[in-house]
Curated annotation (Swiss-Prot):
Phylogenetic placement of the source organism: Bacteria, Bacillati, Cyanobacteriota, Cyanophyceae, Synechococcales
Cofactor note: Binds 2 Mg(2+) ions per subunit. Also able to bind Co(2+), Mn(2+) and Ca(2+) ion.
Name the record gives this protein: Glutamine synthetase
Amino acids binding Mn(2+): 132, 361
Family matches, as Gene3D superfamilies: Glutamine synthetase, N-terminal domain (3.10.20.70), Glutamine synthetase/guanido kinase, catalytic domain (3.30.590.10)
Recorded name of the encoding gene: glnA
Source species: Synechocystis sp. (strain ATCC 27184 / PCC 6803 / Kazusa)
Pfam (any one): Gln-synt_N
Amino acid sequence: MARTPQEVLKWIQDENIKIIDLKFIDTPGIWQHCSFYYDQLDENSFTEGIPFDGSSIRGWKAINESDMCMVPDPNTATIDPFCKEPTLSMICSIKEPRTGEWYNRDPRTIAAKAVEYLRGTGIADTVYFGPEAEFFLFDDIRFGQTENSSYYFADSVEGRWNTGREEEGGNLGYKPGYKQGYFPVAPTDTAQDIRTEMLLTMAGLCVPIEKHHHEVASGGQNELGIKFDKLVNSADNLMIYKYVIKNVAKKYGKTVTFMPKPIFNDNGSGMHVHQSLWKDGQPLFAGDKYAGFSQMGLWYIGGILKHAPALLAFTNPTTNSYKRLVPGFEAPVNLAYSQGNRSASVRIPLSGGNPKAKRLEFRCPDATSNPYLAFAAMLCAGIDGIKNQIDPGEPLDVDIYDLSPEELAKIPSTPGSLEAALEALEKDHEFLTGTGVFSPDFVESWIEYKLDNEVNPMRLRPHPYEFSLYYDC
């Protein structure tokens, strides 16, 4: 909701609000926050920001240059529904106090730069993003890693693996089968009321909502639908989405993960991302080409497909991401596009004759991504496709999963690991850095952070399944 700083300050006064909670996102994509007494906020705070120590924020400044400023966005002001005392919450971007410039490693700033870059090209003045983030709702999660042990244990009342266990009141047996959890009614769907509360809570926070439903996997996989929005707003909405879902779940004694593949041998959780460009209030992806798409829209797809291996370093940025991107679990592993074909990595959804509904859906991403970085990177790839008129090739209007190995060999595939995606980004990042949206320093630090904190530590540790394979060697 559009608000001025003066309106926010008046709201604080009128409602006698004493606590102001300022949220911002770190580089990997986790919200951080600090709460202030109300008198610490004035009109100057909305331009100059409020100082804080950024030395402990992942991927940011070293301790000797750590002073940063949180600049709250008044348009994001809401009352936090999970605080005992009335608390006004705002989402912030980050400034460098020494220079007064926006911080080039702040993901929200990078997202805003992507929109500025789009407008500067003259191609379009607005880009809409619509993420569809899936998640698992568990009743119990335990995990640990020491020098001589490694384990995890995830459990759900809906888990098919629990059909034979003793339960309080008796095991009633309503547990969806593997890959059979899509759209069941109660009592098989145990999360109806929880999802409804999640959805209505988001509506109260001005997130545009659509629907909710059970997803395909057993063990409590769910999805809530929120409407598309402008790039930065959509990323803000996704962070609110995750915040609300986790906190409502906790209220019910449950826990949520957006990990792409927490359960073996069942569907993983993705985050399909719908995208469209507009100019002067008119949609630019509607036309007379394939699937009612415009030539510009096809070039945008060409940019996504060309840069997809590098893009996945931002859209699928964890080692767990690549356990989802495997054949057989409705995950798009082949880089192709199609109308209505959900086995392609880029889909043009069937939208009837409504030009305003023309959009593409990139199906590779997952919700471990930082949405500000992922959306900005996808937009840069699409713009590169338009500027360089990148041909996406012929559409693939067959089920990719039914093709022979010889036919599949002709179709490019997604990277098989986070390390491979980072290697692709190292070789192909001009479409990001050449725009001024991503700085070379940021791309370099992202690769370094992911290798040092995720790829290499995973490589060093024995995996429990290795003991099943090799212990008696």
